[in-house]
Amino acid sequence: MPKIRHLAMICMDPEKLAKFYCEVFEMKEVTRATRNGRTNVFLTDGYINLALLSQKAEGKANGLNHFGFHVEDSDVIAERLKQWDIVGPSDRPPDRVYAEQRATDPEGNMYDIAEGGFDRDLATPKKTKAPVTA
């Protein structure tokens, strides 16, 4: 059964929010990525991951951007989407290492579809990533 494994929030100061969630809720930092001078921080509670994404669209609201499902077989999900007359899912850019695809629900809410996810070796190609053992 597909499982929600991450939420992504748009925020003004991802590093400050990361510190807040780590100190108050004991979340752990998984990684961070800086692109075009903006830093995104990725946290986990060991079960759900929280992506704190830097606001880059001036005047746009902060808040929930998308959520992500971990699935065993993305082709099965694609077939189910067709039954709902939903085109997609679309492949994510290769530099987006935590999810292979993105789609929307009937109201346009975005979600990621990943056969891998945050619990994998980032050096291994997508769809072949083995879980990281601690």
Roles of regions detected by a PLM:
Residues 1-18, 64-67, 117-134:
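N-terminal beta-strand motif that seeds the catalytic metal site of vicinal oxygen chelate
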Residues 2, 8-50:
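Core segments of cupin and vicinal oxygen chelate
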Residues 3-12, 41-44, 57-134, ...:
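Vicinal oxygen chelate
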